[in-house]
């Protein structure tokens, strides 16, 4: 039953803000006061809730027996204490060139290592098989 009143309040605030400002969804304190007079179960918190909401307006719902915050644009949380951060990395297309930069470097290092190993193997193999004395190598 209390959610019904809260939904009715927010629907009235949104409709009223669209009617007054065209496309902006911003609610002033006077709009909430005018809306809550129609619904006696929901009212502004008063002096006990002045500092309850950090970035928003405090509303007291009788059925819930507690305070509820209507956050200003750009804030979220139970007491409107968190700033809504926009993640720009997800909105942009990922840069594919930076993801391929390590690949050629790794391939180049592997290729050079294989070539060096092959040259060392050939050098040692030919050195062992060709251990001939120096006088035999001299051509007459």
Swiss-Prot record:
Sites carrying sugar chains: 34, 95
Record-annotated EGF-like domain positions: 41-81
Xref: InterPro entries: EGF-like_dom, GF_C11R
Induction: Expressed in the early phase of the viral replicative cycle.
Disulfide bonds: 45-58, 53-69, 71-80
Family as reported in the entry's similarity comment: Belongs to the orthopoxvirus OPG019 family.
Record function comment: Stimulates cellular proliferation (hyperplasia)and mobility around infected cells to promote rapid and efficient spread of infection. This effect is beneficial for virus replication in vivo, because poxviruses replicate possibly better in proliferating cells than in quiescent cells. Acts by binding host EGFR, inducing its dimerization, autophosphorylation and leading to activation of several cellular pathways regulating cell proliferation or cell survival.
Annotated protein name in UniProt: Pro-variola growth factor
Gene: OPG019
């Amino acid at each position: 039953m209390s959610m019904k009143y809260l939904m009715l309040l927010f629907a009235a605030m949104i409709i009223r803000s669209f009617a007054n400002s065209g496309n902006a969804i911003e609610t002033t304190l006077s709009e909430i006061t005018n809306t809550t007079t129609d619904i006696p179960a929901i009212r502004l918190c008063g002096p006990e809730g002045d500092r309850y909401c950090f970035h928003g307006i405090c509303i007291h719902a009788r059925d819930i027996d507690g305070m509820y915050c209507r956050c200003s644009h750009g804030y979220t949380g139970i007491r409107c204490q968190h700033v809504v951060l926009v993640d720009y990395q997800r909105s942009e297309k990922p840069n594919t060139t930076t993801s391929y930069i390590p690949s050629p470097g790794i391939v180049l290092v592997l290729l050079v290592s294989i070539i060096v190993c092959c040259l060392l193997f050939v050098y040692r193999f030919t050195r062992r098989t060709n251990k001939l004395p120096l006088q035999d190598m001299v051509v007459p």
